[in-house]
Amino acid sequence: MSSKIKLLVMDVDGTLTDGKINMGPDGEVFKAFDIKDGYGINEMLPAHGIVPAIITGRTSKIVENRARELHITELYQGRHDKLDTLKSLMEKYECSRENVAYIGDDVLDIVCMRECGLVGCPADACGQVKEIAHFVSLKNGGDGAVREFIEYIIASQLMA
């Protein structure tokens, strides 16, 4: 990787979370986020001038709350066509594909991954995603995979 990453785009379910949808007796939904991922997003990315963004196919108040907590202003929920949103973000931040990293876990992410210069995925991503990823985390989604990818991005840029 020789170009500077300016934008990290993340999927939620299966990437920032373990992909499970836990439901309470009254239909309330619970999601678990890894604190290490949060530190990487909230502290490490800004320190290196990298903008975090979330594009997810589902809509959830929980995700909105977590994004706010991590100061993620680029939150796009309910996006089944993630590519249009990705292209808008690239235009907004004046990024070429080489300036964009993407981490996701499933086939809906592949169309975006093919447009990014650096692609990562959790250890438990589907096979098609692992085949095109430049970085496969040792961690599963929701268990620090995003933090590992952030550390990889930063280390790669420091070595360049």
PLM feature spans:
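Alpha-helical substrate-recognition element adjacent to the catalytic core
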Residues: 1-81
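Mg2+-dependent phosphoryl-transfer enzymes with acidic/Ser/Thr/Gly-rich catalytic loops
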Residues: 27-31, 69, 83-160
